[in-house]
Amino acid sequence: MAKAKKQPRPKAITPKGFRDYFGEEVTQRTHMLATIAEVYHHYGFEALESSAVETVEALGKFLPDVDRPNEGVFAWQEAEDDGKGDWMALRYDLTAPLARVYAQHRNDLPSPYRRYAMGPVWRNEKPGPGRFRQFYQCDADTVGTASMAADAEICMMLSDTLEKVGIPRGDYLVRVNNRKVLNGVLEAMGLLEDDPKRDDVLRTIDKFDKVGESGVRELLGKGRLDASGAYIDGVGLEDHQAEPVLAFLTSKGDTVTETMTNLRAAVGDSKVGQEGIAELELMGSLFAAAGYGEDRILIDPSIVRGLGYYTGPVFEAELTFEIFDEKGRKRQFGSVAGGGRYDGLVKRFTGQEVPAVGLSIGVDRLLAALREKGRLAATPTGPVVVTVMDRDRMADYQAMVAELRQAGIRAEVYLGNPKNFGNQLKYADKRHSPIAVIEGGDEKDRGVVQIKDLILGAKIAESATLEEWKERPSQFEVPRTELVAKVREILVSQSSDREG
């Protein structure tokens, strides 16, 4: 009789571009999301939770990779017997689902509709160091008003959010630009809306932060050699045609007034360009009136990312402190959030233009920034562990842990094999437990428990002298009736030591 073929065991590995998150990271992210939600709620925004799956039709062409519509997402087609054979996809951001939600429920929603949303998004793109296919976003949007006060409010809320999560003033800057100003520049160049060179110019402008003014000048003209030595063809503009773009990119002055003067020169007589400048001036006045100075929010025409997507103001939150990259070189941390006005997104569903403005915070990048600066909370304290000295007295240990929990103290009974007491303490150490509670048969007969301060014990083991150990022992005996009070007292003392 032939042997049955042995089935290979599945490999226990995460898919490429994905990762697992454990206790401390999850706790830190949960805390950050709650802090951000508190700011959004304070501004009057309401929470929205939409499906992680949308139809590809609903997502439309506002995909991560605009040059490859329907690429860059995790998509599949429903079977005909399950539905209509529709293509479905995991959401790649939180904005496209909002457009669908607003179009579907607009008759029941207040106008303007102010919502915030938080959660994972998925992008089927090539992963890299620190770049994953699943990551968290935290958005807030106002749909249904064209007022620049909405745009200004979003920028101010972003500033408040960064400070609330632990980025102090001086370590960040919210920079603001306007797509209409760029449209005015394109008009001043003689490039009308149907001119194919407009997209080439936009792509070139997007490289400004990488190649600088001289690089953009070359790419707008005949072309340039990149760092690898390869030649990149240029847009083919004459020098005089390229000047308005260069004037636009370098128009930031020492004051807002100077910047606006430079922008007016760049857009010339363009009506849409002048409209964009007026919007920036209005936003600037609103920032000033609310007490948000240029050390927090700054009008800056050099912000060009996303200008192909947005229809009006666009902004980016940049962290200005320096970090060391993987090669030990100093660099600025860079952008952690962005947003702007996108008046065309809902129109795909309704046929009518619906004004909207919003922001999106990259939660994982913001967490990485706080971790880099040592501004995240230390490793969270684990539960108090009630050890098991006699497996036949589990009811006694459960009674202890129940008392601790009823007093609001996080606690658990050791549920592994209690035979080796040392393994119980190793378990408590791995859980970052602050205290272990011990009650053997002798303690039970005498009506006492042993309490072991694991935090103090670790410190003593590292550096304390014999005299210090005698003066402040890490393990002591208390009456069983005082268990809760003594545990609480030690936890308060440990908390004070951490804060001190």
Curated annotation (Swiss-Prot):
Gene3D superfamilies per record: Anticodon-binding domain, Bira Bifunctional Protein, Domain 2
GO molecular function, one term: histidine-tRNA ligase activity
Main location: cytoplasm
CDD domains: HisRS-like_core (cd00773), HisRS_anticodon (cd00859)
Provenance organism: Ruegeria sp. (strain TM1040) (Silicibacter sp.)
Localization, UniProt: Cytoplasm
Assembly behavior: Homodimer.
EC number: 6.1.1.21
Entry protein name: Histidine--tRNA ligase
Family, as annotated: Belongs to the class-II aminoacyl-tRNA synthetase family.
Record SUPFAM superfamilies: Class II aaRS ABD-related, Class II aaRS and biotin synthetases
Highest taxon of the lineage: Bacteria
Enzyme class per UniProt: ligase
PANTHER family: HISTIDINE--TRNA LIGASE, HISTIDYL-TRNA SYNTHETASE
Any Pfam family hit: HGTP_anticodon
Record-level GO cellular component terms: cytoplasm
Record key words, sorted: Aminoacyl-tRNA synthetase, ATP-binding, Cytoplasm, Ligase, Nucleotide-binding, Protein biosynthesis
Catalytic reactions of this protein: tRNA(His) + L-histidine + ATP = L-histidyl-tRNA(His) + AMP + diphosphate + H(+)
GO biological process, any: histidyl-tRNA aminoacylation
InterPro entries reported in the protein's UniProt record: aa-tRNA-synth_II, aa-tRNA-synth_II/BPL/LPL, Anticodon-bd, Anticodon-bd_dom_sf, His-tRNA-ligase, HisRS-like_core, HisRS/HisZ, HisRS_anticodon
